[in-house]
Curated annotation (Swiss-Prot):
Root EC class: hydrolase
A GO BP entry: positive regulation of translation
UniProt catalytic activity: GTP + H2O = GDP + phosphate + H(+)
Organism: Acidobacterium capsulatum (strain ATCC 51196 / DSM 11244 / BCRC 80197 / JCM 7670 / NBRC 15755 / NCIMB 13165 / 161)
Primary gene name: lepA
Pfam families, per the entry: EFG_C, GTP_EFTU, GTP_EFTU_D2, LepA_C
HAMAP family referenced in this protein's UniProt entry, alphabetically: LepA (MF_00071)
Domain of life per record: Bacteria
Transmembrane segments: none
The name this protein goes by in its record: Elongation factor 4
Length: 605
């Protein structure tokens, strides 16, 4: 097909603003699916995607649309994840397009992720069509939403298209706007091949399936291709397009989007953002914008039943086949046995992996408190990167610690600003910007340590704002901070799985809260149990779980006091001996207490 009849576009929106529903309507109206094949959220194939109402993986669907001008156009919809953890995937998906539909909920207005993804689209030079969705809701306010789009995003919203993706009202106008307002792709089909990988997944029968947008040249079946980031060479076995059912074709030329299967065995070879070129006639340089995805959040994952350790390893390897952005390595803990240290893109990514392990592989898991990666400069001038408290060096050898920092954008209603400011200050935030987007809607920009975000920030932000605040963030460098490792000792023995890295100024209250929480959770023993929080050799907080005592003087009726004293002394000696040799079993809830401490201190405020 002539490239002037091709339109490549993405749909960008905040979670729950109706992106997947609009995609369904477009598929229905272009006749890509029969009524029988239609089901809600066609493109969200994973159960988790449907349940949480989020898109986790990118998808690409080809539709044929006969426009009012009588021509048939090929529309390639690239469905992108909306969540901040997957923003690199979004940026690569957007780089595959010439235009984007910016969907805004008419009742909620512009949210933080709408903004973040809209800026990504603008930076990629895309033509943006604003679409105001959910106009069938009684609380819909089209005029106010247009004003918000103009003020917050800086786009002209006078010709924004009002639609209801649920009922189908206004959707034909969206199709016409895609054809009329979005530019066709540019690219020379005869130039050396350059194709951008924007997603890949593993199929048990065919190996790795790669989604790509051909920028220049033509990709053909049987061609020997080379991946430009690692120089690996593969043969293309088959290729095609998703309509959304896979349909095999012989070639993809400049401007087209489709999938190909080559002799690739692992997803880690096909990095998102990489450039595919022909081995015999390679392109002079790769497409711009490729980055290696780095894990941001780290946690230990262990099985409740230590015999299931090998099952956990197999499950993680299977998940890694489909998700090269998360990594794991074996680690062992005295308290929890054998497990794995895992790295994730963010908190949602961690939750999704954990839920998939429990749901798809039927495993019972314990997850340790999530942490981040610190850069440590030692007194001898060398540097270390540490993401696990157990590898924290001796404090006397540390010169300085740098912690990762994020730039957070929070959009909220003005009545909740006070509570949010208090929360952000508590989390060591530094204000960058404060502006009114509309008379009642405020946009706050803060720099915050990632370490403070990973535990409970999002939940607390939602509770402070009664669910009306939305958050988006990206990495913004590092700060030098006095971070220390805090150990929890039970009966004088450090429990490695409970160690955490904290800011020195907050160590005392964090330690105090943690040991008092542990005191409630560790069952009473026959001997007293000391629970201590320590930084190095210095104890900063202590609680004691009192011993269970039998009433040894119950059998004494009257008589001399020395008889009773003798029995009590004898009991005390026995308890002392027990304490020396006794072992304390720490229940699973105690490990989860590390995660909950912040929430409890918040609910008391």
């Amino acid at each position: 097909m002539d490239s002037k009849y091709i339109r490549n576009f993405a749909i960008i929106a905040h979670i729950d603003h109706g992106k997947s529903t609009l995609s369904d309507r477009l598929l229905e109206m272009t006749g890509s699916l029969t009524a029988r094949e239609m089901q809600a959220q066609v493109l969200d194939a994973m159960d988790l995607e449907r349940e949480r109402g989020i898109t986790i993986k990118a998808h690409a669907v080809r539709m044929l649309y006969k426009a009012k001008d009588g021509e048939t156009y090929q529309l390639n919809l690239i469905d992108t994840p909306g969540h901040v953890d997957f923003s690199y995937e979004v940026s690569r998906s957007l780089a595959s397009c010439e235009g984007a539909l910016l969907i805004v909920d008419a009742s909620q207005g512009v949210e933080a992720q709408t903004l973040a993804n809209a800026y990504l689209a603008i930076n990629n030079g895309l033509e943006i069509i604003p679409v105001i969705n959910k106009i069938d809701l009684p609380s819909a306010d089209i005029t106010r939403t247009q004003e918000m789009i103009e003020q917050a995003v800086g786009l002209d919203a006078t010709d924004a298209i009002p639609v209801s993706a649920k009922t189908g009202v206004g959707v034909p106008d969206v199709l016409e706007a895609i054809v009329k307002r979005l530019p066709p792709p540019t690219g020379d089909p005869n130039a050396p091949l350059q194709a951008l990988i924007f997603d890949s997944w593993f199929d048990a029968y065919r190996g790795v399936i790669v989604l790509a947008r051909v920028m220049n040249g033509t990709l053909r079946k049987g061609m020997r291709i080379r991946l430009m980031s690692n120089g690996k060479v593969f043969d293309v076995e088959s290729m095609g397009v998703l309509t959304p059912k896979p349909m095999e074709i012989g070639e993809l030329s400049a401007g087209e989007v489709g999938f190909f299967v080559a002799t690739i065995k692992t997803v880690s070879d096909t990095k998102i953002g990489d450039t595919v070129t022909e081995d015999a006639r390679p392109a002079a340089e790769p497409l711009a914008g490729f980055e290696d995805i780095k894990s941001m959040v780290f946690a230990g994952i262990y099985t409740v039943d230590s015999h299931e350790h090998t099952l956990l390893r197999d499950a993680l390897e299977k998940l890694r086949l489909n998700d090269s952005s998360f990594f794991f390595e074996p680690e062992s803990s005295v308290a929890l046995g054998f497990g794995f240290r895992c790295g994730f893109l963010g908190l949602l990514h961690m939750e999704i992996i954990q839920e998939r392990l429990e749901r798809e592989f039927d495993l019972d898991l314990i997850t340790t408190a999530p942490g981040v990666r610190y850069k440590i400069t030692m007194t001898d001038g060398s540097t270390l990167e540490v993401d696990n408290p157990s590898r924290w060096p001796d404090p006397s050898e540390i010169e300085q610690v740098e912690e990762p920092v994020i730039r957070a954008t929070i959009l909220t209603n003005e009545e909740y600003v006070g509570g949010i400011l208090k929360l952000v200050e508590e989390k060591r935030g530094r204000q960058q910007n404060f502006e009114y987007v509309t008379p009642t809607r405020v946009m706050l920009t803060y720099e915050l340590p990632l370490n403070e975000i990973v535990l409970d920030f999002y939940d607390r932000l939602k509770s402070v704002s009664r669910g009306y605040a939305s958050l988006d963030y990206q990495l913004a460098g590092t700060w030098v901070s006095p971070m220390v490792k805090m150990d929890i000792l039970v009966s004088g023995e450090p429990v490695d799985a409970l160690s955490i890295i904290v800011h020195r100024d907050f160590a005392y209250e964090r330690g105090r809260a943690l040991v008092s929480k542990m005191r409630e959770l560790i069952p009473r023993q026959q001997f007293e149990v000391a629970i201590q929080a320590a930084i190095g050799s210095k104890i900063i907080a202590r609680e004691t779980v009192a011993a269970l005592r039998k009433n040894v003087i119950a059998k004494c009726y009257g008589g001399d006091i020395s008889r009773k004293r003798k029995l009590l002394e004898k009991q005390k000696e026995g308890k002392k001996r027990m304490k020396r040799i006794g072992k304390v079993d720490i229940p699973q809830e105690a490990f989860l207490a590390v995660l909950k401490v912040g929430e409890d201190s918040a609910s008391k405020n």
